[in-house]
Amino acid sequence: MHLAYPAVLSALLFCTGLYGVLARRNAILVLMSVELMLNAVNLNLVAFDVWLSRAAEETLHSGQALTLFTIAIAAAEIGIGLAIVLAVHRNRGTSDIDKLRDTAEGHEPDGPDTDTPATGTAAEKAEATA
Amino acid sequence: MTTTTLAVLVPLLPFLGAAAGLLLGRSAPGFVRPLAVLPTLAALVLAVLVAARQGGGRAVDAVTELTPTGSVPVELALHIDGFAALVAILVGTVATCVQLYSTGYLRDDPRYPSYAALVSLFTSAMFLVVYSGDLMVLLVGWEIMGICSYFLVGHYWETPEARAASLKAFLVTKLGDVPFLIGLLALATEVGSFRITKILGAVASDSLDHPTLIALLLLAGVAGKSAQFPLHTWLPDAMAGPTPVSALIHAATMVAAGVYFVARLLPLFEASGAAMVVLAVMAAVTMVGSALAALAQDDIKRVLAYSTIGQLGYMTGALATGDRGAAVFHLLTHGAFKALLFLAAGVIIHAAGTNSLAAMSRMRGLRDRVPDAYWTMTVALLALAAIPPFSGFFSKESVLGAAEHVATGHTEHAPGAAGWTVLVAGLVTALLTAAYATRLWLLAFRGRGAEAPDHGRQPVVMNAVLWVLALPSLALGGLAFRLLPDWFDGHDLTPTLTTSVLGTGVALVGGIVTYAAWRHTSALAARTPLGAVAAHPEGDAALVEAEAIAAHRPAYGDLASAPDPSDPGRLLLGPVHRHAAVGFHLDAVYTALFVRPVQAGASLVRFLDREVVDTYVRAAGGLPRLLGAAVRRAQTGNVQTYVSALLAGTVVLAVAAVLVATGA
Amino acid sequence: MTLAAASHGFLSPTGVEIAFLLVGLVTLGAAVLTVTTRQLVHAALWLVVALGGLAVEYLLLTAEFIAWVQVLIYVGAVVVLILFGLMLTRAPIGRSPDADSGNRWAALTVAVASAAALVWVVVDAFRTTWIELDGPAAGSTAVTGASLFQNWVLPFEALSVLLLAALVGAIVLSRRTKAARADEVSRAGTPQGQQGGVR
């Protein structure tokens, strides 16, 4: 099989994930896009490992080993990421990334989407970042 | 202890006293007075011991070089000859008297600790100047005196007069010190040493290339320090300081430093005929001009200040005739009687509550309020007017005698022209001196009008000091003129018949004419009531004086003179009075020549700074501001925007890297 | 290999290649739908399709162990987690008009540009490279296991520590603090949850 097929597919998947990360509003959708990018990398790793295991005399199968590690780390990442998103959602009442703008100049902590308990936390955060 | 150790202790003790006074002034007020008086007194005793051991014989020289300092070595050197030993005694005596007097005069002054410490520091610096055998070390003392003078003149810094006067004193003396420093360096470069003995040796072997240039440069510093024309204008204004400061600094010691310096290096000046003539002309102009100005002043201390300038003129005149013995003789007697005059004037100002002669002339019985000041001041004024047998007579006659000696061509030391200049100016000044001394005495003690206010007795310590100083004023000249030649160069200091008769004669004429004029004018006093009196006459003397100085300008419209028709000086001077009262417009000339151009330059610089330099500065600030505002718009807080920009940049960089790698 | 690659042209694909291409198209399409659909739950479901397609691709590349791990962990665990996440953040069921942020066109530009650059570079570099898929499977469980426990034991164990840390971290992050719990209690008293109303 031509190496170009998995490589091109991997590149396209990666850019699709990239688009998702940059364009999606909901934090969980962004996490899904990150998963897509990670999988694109995995595909690349597997394809090159298969190619190299034929081409080289001795191989450590590093591509497959790293793929397994990536999958494990992706699992950990999605766990932590979801926990953060849940915490943010609990504090702010939203999980929209483009509404979390505490680092901007002139940021108004009392946005229309924040409810009463969120105000205090947001103000604290604004103070911390200021 | 060796003589050298004693001599080193003399400047060191007041210095330590000053340091201790400054350190303990706030925490231990009880120690301030002993710390002020005792080190100075000890220094006086040591100075007497040093003089006794030196005994007018060979000069004591001691040198140590702490560290190499570059091309010309700076050495800690002592050079004690007869001049140094005797001048040190004078400095010690006056400083001790002034410190004692100050304990009474500034009795309630909250700034007394720093004042006393500065006076001690000043005394120490003067001792350093007197004893130092190295010109660089001498310069250190010279400049310390300058800065102490600045602080002490500005002691009443609440009054604008004192602030202006201290700044003026500092700037004018510094104006002279710059050429002085250049002259010192030029001299040291030519000789290869700052040591006085080596310099005198080089002068004796005639190995100086530019004696005239060096002498003239040094003269500028001397003129500034000793208040000689044309750099004398700071001295009358410096009377805004407390009276003891005037007595110590502006009569007896600091202003004498310049004269003393020339006396030390006189052979150097003698090597240049031009310098001697300049010195003589300077002395003559100073003498006559200051005596005329003294006759027109209303402030009692300004009269004394101008008289100081005139007497310093006598000293420089004696130096111009190459007779430093006469100059230092006059320095010694003048130091005694001028200190006495100032201290007595301080008592009078306190008693009368004013420093204005016009106001005093309208007070009856002032002399009965201050009998000690009356008698001692009479003695001092007689000494000032050079009436025999008071001390001033002998020293002044020695000056006139030296001038006559040169004028008649009996010596090779100085040009005859210098002798004639000094002689004629000296005689004229003798006349004027007697006149203003008489005027001062008559106006202060022979006032008519309301009874003088009674503010109680003066502090005992102040009166005691007056009597201590009255002794040398009375007898120093008569006792010393035979002994002093052994200490000095050996020139005879005995008065000659011609000059004695002439000098005493013109002095008597001056006194009598002034008395006549006073008889003529004093009737007018009752018709024009005048008076500027301190607001708190019951306060301590320093407070009274400060208020009197501050009250003078509002009362009379001028700091120096008063519109008083009963003033005999006004009658004697006639049309000259108006000009003499303001010091012959020299301040106005300086204003036109120096102050205005400097101010114009300053405003030009300010304009350039504000309009040109600041434009660049503002632009340098504004441009980043604009850029920052532009960049700030990108900071939306949206993480996705940031990552988009980051990745776009990454893509661009990656493509560029690939293109470069493939050589496209 | 380069010599061998010369005999394999793109115009005469093998069966495996055809299968790879078809599955790849499905995977890519599912991925594009994942990042473009307006229904959040659908996005998660399309993600399942994309990840499953990738598992098939792994199989086609003879990496069977990776393929089953992919199915187990991604399709089985991660997607379920994401669905839980969507549920807990009360993601709306149905079409939501604001699924994409205003950054979309910038994102599209960046993505297309990077895709073009990557594809260009990759194709330029590997257009003649050929993977020999005949012979023993390169990614069979035996081979992978041997390499993993011979050469990669230490990173493997380190990874277990990392997973433990992530586990603890996730628990700590999602625990409610006392204050938050008090808020929750007080909010339970109000007739309707404000957040649901806002969303």
UniProtKB/Swiss-Prot annotation, chain A:
Gene Ontology MF: a single term: NADH:ubiquinone reductase (non-electrogenic) activity
Residue ranges spanning the membrane: these are 3-23, 28-48, 68-88
Where is composition skewed (Basic and acidic residues) in this entry? 97-110
Membrane-topology annotation of the record: Multi-pass membrane protein
Give me any GO biological process, just one: ATP synthesis coupled electron transport
Q: What is its EC number?
A: 7.1.1.-
- The UniProt regions of compositional bias labelled Low complexity, in chain numbering, are 114-123
Q: Does the keyword NAD belong to this entry?
A: yes
The reaction(s) catalysed by this protein are: a quinone + NADH + 5 H(+)(in) = a quinol + NAD(+) + 4 H(+)(out)
Q: Which UniProt keywords apply?
A: Cell membrane, Membrane, NAD, Quinone, Translocase, Transmembrane, Transmembrane helix, Transport
Q: Where in the cell is it found?
A: Cell membrane
Chain segments carrying region Disordered: 97-130
Q: Keyword Translocase on this protein? A: yes
Question: What Pfam families does UniProt report for this protein, alphabetically?
Answer: Oxidored_q2
Q: What does the function comment of this entry state?
A: NDH-1 shuttles electrons from NADH, via FMN and iron-sulfur (Fe-S) centers, to quinones in the respiratory chain. The immediate electron acceptor for the enzyme in this species is believed to be a menaquinone. Couples the redox reaction to proton translocation (for every two electrons transferred, four hydrogen ions are translocated across the cytoplasmic membrane), and thus conserves the redox energy in a proton gradient.
Q: How does it assemble?
A: NDH-1 is composed of 14 different subunits. Subunits NuoA, H, J, K, L, M, N constitute the membrane sector of the complex.
Q: Which protein family is named in the record?
A: Belongs to the complex I subunit 4L family.
Name assigned to this protein: NADH-quinone oxidoreductase subunit K 1
The gene name on file is: nuoK1
